[in-house]
Amino acid sequence: MMDRRGFLAAGAAAMAGLGAGLAQRARGEDLRAPSPGQLALDDVQSAHLRHISNLAAMPDGEWRHMGSIDPGQEWLDAYRYQLAFMAYTLGLAAYHHLPAATETLRGPFDALIGKMLRREVWAYWRATSQSGPRLDPGLAALREPWTDPVVRENIMYSGHLLAMVAMYRMLFGDTKYDTAGSLTFRYDPIFYGKGPETYAYDHGTLQRRIVEQFAEFHDLGVPCEPNNIFVVCNQYPLLAVRFRDAVDGTEHLDPLLASYRRAWDARGGVIDGRDSVIWSLMVRQQRLIDYPTPDSAWTLGALNCWMPDRVRAVSGRYAKLWLKETAEGTLQIRPPHELHAMATGTPVGPAMPYRSPALGYAALWLSEVGDRERLTALLDHADRFMQPTTEHGGLFYPRVDRSTDAAGRMTYMDPLTGNALLAYARINVIDGMRALYERPWTARPSGPSIVAVTGATLRRAVHRDGGQTIEFDLVADAATAAPIVVGFGALTPGRTWQLTETGRGGRAGDGRSARIPVDARGQARIASAIGAQRYRLEAVG
């Protein structure tokens, strides 16, 4: 498997005039995602969420289990990607499984945004901004460096930051990042430089600067590293603009996406007429890179939001190319030397190692297009051969740099896949991110909500009866004998609220019930060693 630098150096002839181009938003197959709150989280999914919450709660500067094989935050498993995909996983859980309990995930999500602003996450850009002949063949001299990580290029960071902030605002109704200076980058090394550098943004100014750059680069998107526009990295700012439009009642995405579509149609489309998935465009050379790397599974998963019919049309072909069945019946990423030989016709030795998060990208893509059979086989491989580990109740897969075991089975595990992407794939539903894109919340769901839970794991929380009732599932934490404590918010003071144990159908039966006292702020708290799994909170008077 070529690494990203290999893709940049490889190049390919431009493929103008090919393909049907990009489908407009809202076209394609009908959305197939289940109704929010229909599906409860299971033990494994809940453990993934616990791990993400554990990492989000780490002190600033503590990057436990997040160390990358690359020392400069330049590779595909850098902190920025781990933080972003952990946040997106929380977002998927909030939207699809816990729509009546989003507040329970707001703190970890916000903490991930805070970590995204730390210097060790984005300071690589000061050196990267100089470019070089590996990124820009024929470059005569390095550019003057700049520190601001979002003012120009670097969409591989700024696009994810914008998507995180926009998703946070849409899901939790918190406008804190609309405040001037709420997204501030501080660069103040102790031993060098001419003093502190500060670059202040907020949600609105960050989005505005990114949209301006789309126009500056002829509507094809914004470069990641200098001179290279990667298709996948530009999908996340498009998502972000969609989320903000939903909340603000604006329509900024439609003209932006229309221009993006026209620009790429003129070059054959991001999925061209030969069904090649475009990886990147070298700007100055106007060269398209379409090497069929399994890393493009990430691109397909992201494009499913607004061109699902095209993505599904090519997914079967790429699943056969990128995935390989093992003797045990699991699926792994096809070994890099086999992929290279298939793509180029040039055999290479089996020593070519795995070095990208391709397994995680494939899991993300399969979860989004709803290929449950292949996804299950891929996850089964991870569970059998990639050391699933539980720590403080959280499930993750620790980093392993060794490519294969003695039997040739893939054992390579990067921290992006192990901390975030397999969690994302498990918690996602078919068309999961597409559902957020097509049906973003214009406001937080109204009515009562669950705001905190201790002593138990919340598996599902959904509004019923027009938002006036909560139905939720709890499972007591096996490792503790502490009572279950549940905090509620947005309860109407003066009304009588009743909590009832229900059957699996959600209807009150022979289960116990109790009246819940509500304070003047519309909040309530219960503490009980209750043992049932499903409950219903409703106003009865």
PLM region descriptions:
Residues 6-25:
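N-terminal export signals
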Residues 26-67, 92, 139-142, 165-175, ...:
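Terminal, non-catalytic domain-edge segments
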Residues 29-128:
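Extreme N-terminal leader/anchor segments
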Residues 45-49, 53, 87, 102-121, ...:
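Hydrophobic core segments within long, regular secondary-structure runs in both alpha-
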Residues 74-88, 149-163, 228-236, 290-298, ...:
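Aromatic- and histidine-enriched alpha-helix N-cap/loop-to-helix transition segments
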Residues 97-228, 274-276:
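Extended ligand-binding groove/face enriched in aromatic
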Residues 183, 190-205, 209, 213-357:
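Extended ligand-binding clefts on enzyme/binding-domain cores
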Residues 501-523:
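Solvent-exposed beta-strand/loop surfaces of large extracellular or lumenal domains
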